A protein has these predicted regions:
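Short linear sequence motif anchored by a di-proline
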Residues: 1-209
Length: 209
């Protein structure tokens, strides 16, 4: 999977009510192992005591796409997605809202079914017709280089038509849903982990027919 965020940091920050600060993002695609804008309402680093008497602001900061795997999995690649919400590796981060974050995007790519012309698999870029810049649900882990992983859920009809079983969790286009993910209890936040309506998605296949 890849995704794109075709908007500069300042514009994304305004759209999500987040302080962009010195984020250098100017727009483009994001691949695993690259830094990308992340919107969080928690601390930048969890080590140390929580600041007393101060409300933490929603802000956008660069973080690495990919979380170091558990120590019990030697020589494994970084983990890019969260699929098992009950996994001991993830449950603490999911229940603690400080570790939940939003990943802004304008489209994401999955490999689709082979082209009828040449039999080669095509890139399928999925966008949301009802929100030009959307938020994908994610969590981050506090490590030497803090990284994030996207939450995955069952694929909707548009993704299943291309042979996919899962898709990233896309939040509805309203501030209330984003607030629940960033601040709410896990019982409320977990209810957002569901497929986005395929009727609200557009797909572009490359190369085109």
């Amino acid at each position: 999977m890849l995704y794109r965020l075709d908007a500069a940091a300042a514009a994304v920050g305004r759209a999500f009510g987040a302080r962009a600060g010195d984020d250098p993002w100017a727009g483009g695609h994001v691949a695993p192992g690259q830094f990308a804008p992340v919107i969080t309402a928690g601390r930048e680093f969890i080590a140390g005591p929580r600041p007393a008497g101060r409300t933490l602001e929603t802000r956008m900061i660069p973080r690495l796409w990919g979380v170091p795997p558990p120590p019990s999995v030697p020589d494994a690649r970084p983990v890019l997605t969260v699929r098992n919400l009950q996994s001991p590796f993830w449950i603490g981060n999911l229940r603690n809202s400080e570790f939940r974050c939003l990943i802004p995007a304008t489209a994401f790519m999955e490999w689709g079914k082979p082209s009828p012309k040449d039999g080669k698999r095509r890139q399928c870029w999925f966008a949301c017709a009802d929100q030009p810049v959307f938020a994908m649900a994610a969590v981050w882990k506090d490590s030497e280089v803090p990284g994030f992983a996207l939450l995955a859920c069952e694929a909707n009809a548009a993704l299943r038509a291309e042979g996919r079983d899962t898709m990233p969790v896309i939040l509805p286009p309203d501030a209330a849903a984003r607030d629940v993910w960033l601040h709410g209890g896990w019982d409320r936040a977990q209810a957002l982990v569901q497929p986005y309506s395929s009727s609200l998605m557009a797909v572009r296949r490359l190369p085109e027919d």
